[in-house]
């Protein structure tokens, strides 16, 4: 009963922040913002320190938004250490700075490490910004510096595919 009450309070708080939170957060402080999760179902296992969310999962941290079918949050000492997103295609979007074009991406699996500001996209991954794109089976995106690394040297995964379009003449 106690866990259900905690879950209900968390869901109500999450919904409030999801609806009104985008007006409260500054882009440069995404990492300092809480991670807000909204889903159809939620369970927490205190013994394994895992929280599982399923069904139209939406997670938001500042200007970062991830949509997925399932999210598993791994906790360590009461803090979210790793978030694993899975689904038909897990999708993310971030506004890196005021006035900059959004960075978007998708993959079948995503891993987010909040303390390291690192998002890893695995299996059929693509990241876009403006008209440019990176595609690979493995992409790392440093959220703080907007640095994208694609491909794995130690595997036989597909090659990296990059599209760089010229700016339109004015």
For the regions a language model picked out, list residue spans one by one.
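Mature-chain termini and adjacent capping regions
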Residues: 1-170
